[in-house]
């Protein structure tokens, strides 16, 4: 399946991995729609994409921790991208530190953005995706969602939320088998943030170096670019000298 011309909605697209994926998708002649809660961040990434491609992507404010914001974002997406082919659930709030130091507000934000908001957004976009001959729902879960991975700086709420998100992906995969929608996921380890616009994007890394956004973005695009008869349901990606499994 060629990705050129595909419309792809990406949550968390105002920074980090989501932003890197949006820029790389545009470089592949896809039509990204940027979703996120920070308007300034979205507009900055949209400007970078326009400067590289000459095409300015649409931006939609979507706070995954706020279900009203999710509903509003979907209503706008239905107008801006009725030909939506791919949803990438990349947005998620993160918190680190000891469990007893977490506030109720932090816990709620992490759980709501990673679990409730992601599930609600996906459910609301199913009717759009179902109209396409072939579509994808891809979720960036993180190794923190795997039962055998160590915490490595993540908080208890974040690990719990990612475990729930992983369960959501597995259940949705089963429910949508036989439909034109593929459900896939990726579980990256710790990532160094770098954008395709940075000089460091093309730097070769050694075995001891940590993952960069480039490594994960290329893996996501590889998964999405598979032929219609192929589904890479789940992929764990960690640096060669792993920290999560030791």
Please give the residue ranges for each predicted region:
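Substrate-binding pocket helix/loop in short-chain dehydrogenase/reductase
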Residues: 98-99, 103-111
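Catalytic loop of short-chain dehydrogenase/reductase
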Residues: 136-164, 170, 174-177
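Conserved NAD(P)H cofactor-binding loop of Rossmann-fold oxidoreductase domains
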Residues: 90-96
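Conserved glycine-rich cofactor-binding loop
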Residues: 12-16
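C-terminal helical subdomain
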Residues: 181, 185, 203-245
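Conserved glycine-rich Rossmann-like NAD(P)H-binding loop of the short-chain dehydrogenase/reductase
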Residues: 30-45
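Active-site loop of short-chain dehydrogenase/reductase
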Residues: 6, 82-84, 98, 129-143, ...
């Amino acid at each position: 399946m060629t990705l050129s011309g595909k419309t792809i909605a990406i949550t968390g697209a105002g920074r980090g991995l989501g932003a890197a994926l949006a820029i790389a998708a545009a470089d592949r002649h896809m039509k990204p729609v940027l979703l996120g809660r920070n308007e300034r961040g979205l507009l900055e990434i949209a400007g970078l994409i326009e400067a590289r491609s000459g095409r300015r992507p649409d931006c939609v404010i979507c706070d995954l921790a706020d279900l009203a914001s999710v509903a509003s974002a979907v209503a706008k997406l239905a107008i801006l991208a009725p030909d939506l082919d791919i949803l990438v659930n990349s947005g998620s709030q993160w918190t680190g530190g000891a469990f007893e130091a977490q506030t109720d507000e932090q816990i709620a934000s992490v759980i709501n953005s990673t679990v409730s908001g992601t599930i609600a957004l996906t459910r609301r976009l199913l009717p759009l995706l179902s109209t396409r001959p072939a579509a994808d729902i891809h979720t960036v879960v993180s190794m923190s969602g795997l039962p055998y991975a160590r915490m490595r700086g993540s908080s208890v709420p974040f690990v719990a939320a990612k475990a729930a998100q992983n369960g959501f992906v597995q259940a949705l995969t089963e429910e949508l088998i036989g439909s034109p929608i593929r459900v896939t996921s990726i579980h990256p380890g710790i990532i160094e943030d770098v954008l395709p616009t940075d000089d460091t994007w093309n730097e070769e890394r050694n075995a001891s170096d940590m993952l960069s956004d480039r490594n994960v973005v290329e893996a996501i695009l590889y998964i999405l670019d598979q032929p219609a008869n192929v589904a890479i349901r789940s992929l764990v990606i960690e640096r060669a000298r792993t920290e999560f499994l030791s």
